[in-house]
Amino acid sequence: MTHYILLIIGTALINNFVLVKFLGLCPFMGVSKKIETAVGMGLATMFVLTVASLCAYLVDHYILIPLNATFLRTLVFILVIAVVVQFTEMAINKTSPTLYRLLGIFLPLITTNCAVLGVALLNVNLAHNLTESVVYGFGASLGFSLVLVLFAALRERLVAADIPATFRGSSIALITAGLMSLAFMGFTGLVK
């Protein structure tokens, strides 16, 4: 049990996919203008990443490896992720149409979120078993959601701040993301 808790902490804080591995920057920058949309996107990504990790493991170990078709991993994982995203999109549309409208184009873009594909491929490269794959996917999504919500809160505060004209918009957002990355470096060495 300790191994799984350390895997979650390590994936969410120390090896954060956005701030350390620079995966998932498109939704990180695009959806982080309001906390409400950031929370919704974080929850949707959390569900997709966890389920996609499970499905990718099952497809890899029960279809690709027995058929000796591991060269198709990337393509098959993208298809698996697309199916999971479509399922998530339909579920959000039925349960919360307001959130569905707020997320707009970013919900289908989870399919092309490189963090989701990166987690699936890293699970294979790190030789995780089924439980470790799901926990790794959950930890990565937890870290993504945490950083997304924190960044959205900072960006909401930046709207009211007196920022020079040349730094408004993407410039100050990237500077803020860099400072967040430096802050998360403080977690290095937390888990050995």
Swiss-Prot record:
It holds the Pfam family Rnf-Nqr. One of its GO terms (cellular component) is plasma membrane. Its EC number is 7.-.-.-. Keywords: Cell inner membrane, Cell membrane, Electron transport, Membrane, Translocase, Transmembrane, Transmembrane helix, Transport. It is an enzyme of class 7 (translocase). It is found in: Cell inner membrane. It is a multi-pass membrane protein. One of its GO terms (biological process) is electron transport chain. The chain crosses the membrane at residues 5-25, 39-59, 63-83, 102-122, 134-154, 171-191. It comes from the Bacteria. Part of a membrane-bound complex that couples electron transfer with translocation of ions across the membrane. Belongs to the NqrDE/RnfAE family. The complex is composed of six subunits: RnfA, RnfB, RnfC, RnfD, RnfE and RnfG. This is Ion-translocating oxidoreductase complex subunit A. It comes from Haemophilus influenzae (strain ATCC 51907 / DSM 11121 / KW20 / Rd). The lineage of its organism: Bacteria, Pseudomonadati, Pseudomonadota, Gammaproteobacteria, Pasteurellales. The gene is rnfA.
